[in-house]
């Protein structure tokens, strides 16, 4: 596996008409199967620090990380109004943040998903089989519905935080994920809370977008709160929540006439054709389709394009045009010289 190589030069334009020519899209897809943006894991496994972390001090380091994550969640609940950690609002009849940190760390009820409760939005599960990871800090910024007038699309918050030197692990349309790890400091946690409070103040003051994020030239000349409302209205008008949910409902899963390996072999051998994205329904994908963020595969190579999957990717194309500063990178969807999207499918 390659790990963050600087570049690979592909100098084969003179072979463009030869049968052995490998198009850029095919090379890129194959290359991405063997690369990681993370450090080289086998090297990490041999580091002395790794051995140190898994010695007797390991549990203590993770306990400290756990404690910091609890303190951060309590701080967010007490000091912010637009941002809420994804947690049960009430535990044992009290608000989550009213529990003592030591009590929270010992009681799984503070991280439980109860099928009788509505706050988490999940259905179709029973009992106490699911718990939230206590060292993950999932911050919600709103909801797809119109229930909250102050819903803030998280791509905007994510971009702002990156301007402040804070990079979320992952983000969705209304969630931001952070990981509490050994080595995280209280200063680092406070920096995040302060940044979110600054965002809230700018939202309340309806500060001009160009003043709030001056490094992003494509933003409109309107207030932050007005922009958030327009952004949220766009997502609601396109029913983005249901489009996203349909990708992960078992009854909506696409058929897979080919295995991933078979699809990739067809892709390499040339049994492929590029078609406009809007004509993909009913065709077999030869590449994994993955929007980033959040970085989750929405259609795997070998699976068939369905109406739901196509609707979601057409929505993402429209989203990228309306809000280019927040447009996700989409692996598997390509664009020609005119900017029109196309995908690779199994040839007839």
Name what the model sees in each region:
Residues 1-30, 35-46:
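Active-site PLP attachment segment
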Residues 18-20, 53, 184, 305:
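Short loop/turn segments at secondary-structure transitions that flank enzyme active sites
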Residues 26, 49, 294-295:
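A general alpha-helix detector
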Residues 33-37, 56-63:
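Flexible, glycine/proline-enriched loop segments at strand-loop-helix junctions
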Residues 48-55:
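Short glycine/serine- and small hydrophobic-enriched flexible loop segments
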Residues 59-348:
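Non-catalytic terminal extensions of PLP-dependent enzymes
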């Amino acid at each position: 596996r390659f790990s963050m190589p600087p570049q690979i030069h592909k100098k084969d334009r003179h072979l463009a008409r030869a049968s052995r020519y490998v198009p850029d899209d095919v090379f890129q897809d194959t290359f991405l199967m063997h690369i990681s943006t993370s450090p080289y894991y086998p090297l990490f496994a041999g580091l002395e620090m790794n051995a140190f972390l898994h010695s007797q001090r390991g549990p203590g380091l993770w306990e400290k990380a756990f404690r910091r994550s609890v303190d951060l969640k309590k701080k967010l609940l007490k000091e912010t109004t637009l941002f809420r950690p994804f947690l049960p609002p009430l535990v044992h009849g009290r608000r989550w943040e009213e529990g003592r940190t030591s009590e929270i760390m010992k009681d799984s009820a503070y991280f439980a998903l109860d099928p009788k409760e509505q706050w988490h939005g999940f259905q179709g599960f029973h009992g106490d089989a699911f718990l939230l990871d206590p060292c993950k800090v999932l911050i919600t910024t709103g909801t797809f519905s119109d229930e909250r007038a102050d819903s803030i699309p998280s791509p905007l918050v994510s971009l702002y935080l990156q301007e402040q030197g804070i990079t979320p692990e992952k983000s969705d349309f209304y969630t931001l994920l952070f990981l509490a790890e050994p080595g995280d400091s209280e200063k680092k946690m406070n920096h995040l809370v302060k940044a979110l409070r600054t965002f809230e103040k700018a939202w309340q003051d309806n500060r001009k977008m160009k003043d709030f994020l001056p490094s992003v030239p494509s933003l409109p000349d309107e207030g932050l709160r007005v922009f958030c409302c327009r952004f949220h209205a766009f997502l609601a008008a396109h029913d983005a929540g249901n489009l996203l949910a349909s990708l992960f409902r078992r009854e909506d899963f696409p058929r897979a006439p080919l295995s991933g390996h078979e699809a990739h072999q067809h892709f390499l051998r040339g049994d492929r054709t590029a078609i406009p994205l809007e004509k993909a329904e009913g065709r077999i994908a030869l590449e994994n389709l993955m929007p980033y963020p959040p970085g989750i595969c929405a259609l795997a190579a070998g699976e068939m394009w369905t109406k739901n999957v196509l609707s979601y990717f057409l929505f993402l194309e429209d989203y990228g045009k309306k809000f280019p500063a927040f447009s996700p990178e989409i692996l598997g969807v390509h664009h020609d010289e005119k900017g029109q999207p196309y995908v690779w499918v199994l040839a007839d």
